[in-house]
């Protein structure tokens, strides 16, 4: 398959998988435990930083224009949901995962990359949640209450997602021919020569 087409197909695939992951959930108070970050981490590990981040940007943009692919629907009004920051955070999270993992097939390196991406996700999501809950909705929640609302209960599930992503992605990269001939900057590894990698 043509390299450009293959990358676009995988980008669309991971945008769709992230959407599906939104509905595989366990409801909580302000958010839900979902499989979204599993697919975000896999996008960064399999597609590289740029294409991985693009897949998540496509997902977020499609939800903002009205497709009901977020946990509680879609549309621009979703920006006023306390959890929207976590959706935005999927984009830099995938970028960080791809940047840290680079071309490595080492599961430990992939786990570290996924952990770094998770930190990026919370770095965007938690301040956004605090802003909406306290400044917009007037909840007046303390720092510890925010941690329990948006992060601490989710960490065990996040750990499982990181382990799964780091376990399956080395095999998938080889089977999908995504591990041959990467450049040195965390781009998508592809089965072509490095000087022919598609840039955008």
What are these regions, as identified by a protein language model?
Residues 21-33, 60-93:
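Interfacial aromatic-anchored transmembrane helix boundaries in multi-pass membrane proteins
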Residues 3-14, 36-40, 82, 86, ...:
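Residue-level signature of transmembrane alpha-helical entry/exit and packing/kink sites
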Residues 52-59, 66-70, 96-97, 121, ...:
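Alpha-helical transmembrane segments and their lipid-water interface positions
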Residues 46-50, 96-104, 171-176:
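Structural signal for the C-terminal ends of transmembrane alpha-helices
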Residues 188, 194, 200:
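Cationic, low-complexity basic patches in intrinsically disordered or flexible, solvent-exposed regions
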Residues 104-183:
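Membrane-embedded alpha-helical hairpins and interfacial helices in multi-pass inner-membrane proteins
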Residues 1-55, 65:
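Hydrophobic transmembrane alpha-helices
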Residues 13, 20, 77-123:
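Short helix-perturbing small/polar motifs within transmembrane alpha-helices
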């Amino acid at each position: 398959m043509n390299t450009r087409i293959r990358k676009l197909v995988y980008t669309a695939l991971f945008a769709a998988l992230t959407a599906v992951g939104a509905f595989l959930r366990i409801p909580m108070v302000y958010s839900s435990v979902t499989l979204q970050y599993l697919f975000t981490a896999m996008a960064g590990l399999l597609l590289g930083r740029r294409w991985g981040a693009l897949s998540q940007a496509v997902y977020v943009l499609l939800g903002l224009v009205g497709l009901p692919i977020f946990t509680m629907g879609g549309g621009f009004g979703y920006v006023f949901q306390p959890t929207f920051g976590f959706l935005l955070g999927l984009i830099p999270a995938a970028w960080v995962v791809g940047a840290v993992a680079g071309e490595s097939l080492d599961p430990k390196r992939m786990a570290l990359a996924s952990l770094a991406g998770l930190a990026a996700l919370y770095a965007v999501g938690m301040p956004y949640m605090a802003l909406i809950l306290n400044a917009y909705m007037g909840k007046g929640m303390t720092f510890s209450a925010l941690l329990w609302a948006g992060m601490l209960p989710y960490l065990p599930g996040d750990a499982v997602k990181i382990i799964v992503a780091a376990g399956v992605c080395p095999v998938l990269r080889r089977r999908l021919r995504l591990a041959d001939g990467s450049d040195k900057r965390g781009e998508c590894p592809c089965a072509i020569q490095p000087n022919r990698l598609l840039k955008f």
